[in-house]
Amino acid sequence: VILLLLIASAPSVDAQPKTKDDVPLAPLHDNAKSALQHLNQRCCQTFYWCCGQGK
């Protein structure tokens, strides 16, 4: 029983210190969203059906 309590109170993976190689995910998400919006705009200008309005 004591062993189970010790395991449950151990630090989780999220508690690890950040390293210099860690990259925040928010900028990556913003870049991906921006790229998809740009591709969608180019596609809609060229092909009416690919932006979902031609259905």
From Swiss-Prot:
Keywords: Amidation, Disulfide bond, Ion channel impairing toxin, Neurotoxin, Secreted, Signal, Toxin
GO CC annotation terms, alphabetical: extracellular region
Pfam families, alphabetized: Chi-conotoxin
Cellular location(s): Secreted
GO MF terms, alphabetically ordered: ion channel regulator activity; toxin activity
Domain of life according to the entry: Eukaryota
PTM section of the record: Contains 2 disulfide bonds that can be either 'C1-C3, C2-C4' or 'C1-C4, C2-C3', since these disulfide connectivities have been observed for conotoxins with cysteine framework V (for examples, see AC P0DQQ7 and AC P81755).
Positions where Glutamine amide occurs in the chain: Q53
Expressing tissues: Expressed by the venom duct.
Pro-peptide positions on chain: 16-41
Comment text on domains: The cysteine framework is V (CC-CC).
Designated name of the protein: Conotoxin vc5b
Gene source species: Conus victoriae (Queen Victoria cone)
Lineage of the organism: Eukaryota, Metazoa, Spiralia, Lophotrochozoa, Mollusca
